Amino acid sequence: MATPEASGSGRNGQGSDPAVTYYRLEEVAKRNTAEETWMVIHGRVYDITRFLSEHPGGEEVLLEQAGADATESFEDVGHSPDAREMLKQYYIGDVHPNDLKPKDGDKDPSKNNSCQSSWAYWIVPIVGAILIGFLYRHFWADSKSS
């Protein structure tokens, strides 16, 4: 277990909840072996060492994600409500607030490319339609004059 100083625990004033133990991502990254396996799912830290041999998908799957944020992989598999409930028994703390990734709502709007991509999405078909219209008119006019 990490010391409060190493983990950035809420007990020393660095986290927002004094009842929760906070772990830095560097601390979690060190726990990536079969002897000590931690992972992060939705900002929460789990010590799944005891669960490795019981995992239905095999321990290799878990070891690939060990010491890292496994949220995307966990959700991609589509775990059952029972599996999500079982996960609670391996909970040991939260990722330190300074290490959490910003949520989608926290992104800088000036870096949002959705407007640019929507223009590209519409401009190509419009230019194509205009070009086809000119070509059609040109050839239709030529066939009428012949």
Swiss-Prot record:
Its domain of life reads Eukaryota
A GO molecular function held by the record: ubiquinol-cytochrome-c reductase activity
- Sites where Phosphoserine occurs are at S80
- Which terms are listed as keywords in the entry? Acetylation, Electron transport, Heme, Iron, Membrane, Metal-binding, Mitochondrion, Mitochondrion outer membrane, Phosphoprotein, Transmembrane, Transmembrane helix, Transport
Write down any Gene Ontology CC term.
mitochondrial outer membrane
Propeptide residue intervals: 1-11
Q: Cross-referenced PROSITE patterns, in alphabetical order?
A: CYTOCHROME_B5_1, CYTOCHROME_B5_2
Q: Cite the Pfam families for this sequence.
A: Cyt-b5
Q: Name one GO biological process term.
A: nitric oxide biosynthetic process
Q: What sequence ranges are listed for the domain Cytochrome b5 heme-binding?
A: 20-96
Q: Where in this protein does the record say N6-acetyllysine is found?
A: K30
Q: Which residues form a coiled coil?
A: none
Where in the cell?
Answer: Mitochondrion outer membrane
Per the UniProt record, which residue ranges are transmembrane? Answer: 119-136
Q: Which residues bind heme?
A: H55, H79
Q: Which family does it belong to?
A: Belongs to the cytochrome b5 family.
Q: What does this protein do?
A: Cytochrome b5 is a membrane-bound hemoprotein functioning as an electron carrier for several membrane-bound oxygenases.
**Quaternary data:** Component of a complex composed of cytochrome b5, NADH-cytochrome b5 reductase (CYB5R3) and MTARC2.
Q: What is this protein called?
A: Cytochrome b5 type B
Q: What species was this sequence derived from? A: Rattus norvegicus
